[in-house]
C-alpha cells in the first residue's frame, strides 16, 4: 500500500510504501469494540462505596422490647427500612479492568489505521517542523492540510507541537508510544509523520 507524503515547507509530495498486512486489513467491528471497551474500562476509578447494614453506624440493640409495646417487631435500627439505615444492595470498591492480550490490541490498532486509510482520513507528512511555540503555526498547518478535527502523531513527543496546539479545540498530539484505540477513533482525521508511520508499521 502506498501513501502520499506531503512536505509542508516546500508543498511538494512523494510516496511511501507500507505493508498491506498493517494498513489494509479488513474492518473487524467486534475486535475494535472489545479492545476499545476494555481500554475505557481500565480507566475507571472503581472507588464507589456505600454502607450496608453491617457497616453503617448505629446500635445493634433492639430499639424496643420484642413484646408488649404494641409496635411491630424490630431487631435493629441499622436495617434498610430505617432512616439512616444501611443500603440494601450496597456498592463496593471494585476493579473494572479487562484482560486483552497483545495480539488483539495490536490487531485492533491495525484495523483502525486500515479503516482511516481506506476512508482517506489518514494523512502523512514528512515532518511538522514547528520551530517556535505559536498557535498560529498549527492553525496554518491545519489549513494547509485541510483538516479540522485531527490527531497529530509523531515518533517522539514534540514539545513545540504539543504546546502550540493545546489551546485549539479538537486538536490532539501524541507520540507512537501513546497510541490508543479511543484517541484514534475519537478524531475525524489522523496526521502522522513519515518516520512515525514506518515505526508504527514495525510495531504492528
Curated annotation (Swiss-Prot):
Residues 68-77 have a biased composition (Low complexity). Keywords: Ribonucleoprotein, Ribosomal protein, RNA-binding, rRNA-binding. The keyword Ribosomal protein applies. GO terms for biological process: translation. InterPro entries: Ribosomal_uL4 (IPR002136), Ribosomal_uL4-like (IPR013005), Ribosomal_uL4_dom_sf (IPR023574). It comes from the Bacteria. Residues 41-77 are annotated as: Disordered. Residues 47-58 have a biased composition (Polar residues). GO terms for molecular function: rRNA binding; structural constituent of ribosome. The keyword Ligase does not apply. GO terms for cellular component: ribonucleoprotein complex; ribosome. PANTHER family: 50S RIBOSOMAL PROTEIN L4, LARGE RIBOSOMAL SUBUNIT PROTEIN UL4M. HAMAP family: Ribosomal_uL4_B. Part of the 50S ribosomal subunit. One of the primary rRNA binding proteins, this protein initially binds near the 5'-end of the 23S rRNA. It is important during the early stages of 50S assembly. It makes multiple contacts with different domains of the 23S rRNA in the assembled 50S subunit and ribosome. Forms part of the polypeptide exit tunnel. Belongs to the universal ribosomal protein uL4 family. This is Large ribosomal subunit protein uL4. The gene is rplD.
Amino acid at each position: 500500500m502506498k501513501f502520499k507524503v506531503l512536505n509542508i515547507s516546500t508543498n511538494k509530495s512523494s510516496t511511501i510504501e507500507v505493508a498491506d498486512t498493517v494498513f489494509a486489513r479488513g474492518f473487524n467491528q467486534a475486535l475494535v469494540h472489545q479492545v476499545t471497551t476494555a481500554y475505557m474500562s481500565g480507566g475507571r476509578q472503581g472507588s464507589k462505596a456505600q454502607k450496608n447494614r453491617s457497616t453503617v453506624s448505629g446500635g445493634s440493640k433492639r430499639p424496643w422490647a420484642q413484646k408488649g409495646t404494641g409496635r411491630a417487631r424490630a431487631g435493629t435500627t441499622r436495617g434498610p427500612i430505617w432512616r439512616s439505615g444501611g443500603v440494601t444492595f450496597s456498592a463496593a470498591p471494585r476493579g473494572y479492568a479487562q484482560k486483552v492480550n497483545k495480539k488483539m490490541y495490536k490487531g485492533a490498532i491495525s484495523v483502525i489505521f486500515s479503516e482511516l486509510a481506506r476512508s482517506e482520513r489518514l494523512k502523512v507528512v514528512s515532518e511538522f517542523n514547528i520551530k517556535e511555540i505559536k498557535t498560529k503555526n498549527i492553525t496554518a498547518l491545519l489549513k494547509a492540510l485541510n483538516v479540522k478535527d485531527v490527531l497529530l502523531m509523531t515518533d517522539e513527543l514534540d514539545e513545540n507541537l504539543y504546546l502550540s496546539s493545546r489551546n485549539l479545540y479538537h486538536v490532539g498530539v501524541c507520540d507512537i508510544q501513546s497510541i490508543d484505540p479511543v484517541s484514534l477513533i475519537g478524531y475525524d482525521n489522523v496526521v502522522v509523520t513519515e518516520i512515525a508511520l514506518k515505526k508504527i508499521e514495525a510495531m504492528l
